[in-house]
Amino acid sequence: PGEWNIITSGYAQVDGLFHISPWLLILLCPALTMRLIAEERQTGTWDLLRTLPISLSRVVLCKYAAAWTLTAIALLPCSVHYFLVYYIAEPIGNVDGGAFAGSMVGLLFLSATFTSIGLLASSFTKSQIVSFILGAISCFALYWITLQDHYLSMARGVLDLRDVLLFVSITILSLSLSIFVLDRIDKK
């Protein structure tokens, strides 16, 4: 029993899932990204990777794309929840589809941002544990300070350009900082 229990509340909604999901992403994204660069630097394979004729930005962007794709795939079961609620509702289909679509788009933007922050944290250190802790704390702080309001706006079904620009700009900034940090490390 609880406020998000569909059966006992008598109200078919998907809000509960989308209020909990960002908090799970705060832990999932740093966990997925903690090994991307930190482990390669620790084991020495980073030096081997840097001798290949591949630019640093391509390496970082490909690692980011792989981690974000995995995170996006992890979000697919959320659609199962929507269809279950869709068929439980009285009458069938009495669910706010716009809020669901906005929430999914918001989660994709949030996961993109958290993945880039996790990759940046992995760039700073050779330790996977330190990378995870740094990434999780950074994601939590950023979500608590500013991203929560923008995500909740999207979760209501309102897709505002300012929200999208914030997520995209933080993602680009984090990826650029990752490239900058790794370039400085390579030059040492």
Give each language-model segment a name.
Residues 36-66:
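Helix-loop-helix units of permease transmembrane domains in multi-pass membrane transporters
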Residues 11-18, 24, 62-129:
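Secretory targeting signals
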Residues 17, 46-55, 77-83, 127-129, ...:
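Hydrophobic alpha-helical transmembrane segments
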Residues 1-12, 124, 131-188:
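Terminal transmembrane helical anchor/hairpin motif
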Residues 16-39:
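Long, hydrophobic alpha-helical segments
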Residues 1-5, 33, 40, 80-83:
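Transmembrane alpha-helix boundary signature
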Residues 39, 51, 83-87, 123, ...:
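Transmembrane helix-loop junction
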Residues 29-33, 45, 81, 116-117, ...:
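Hydrophobic/aromatic residues in alpha-helical transmembrane segments
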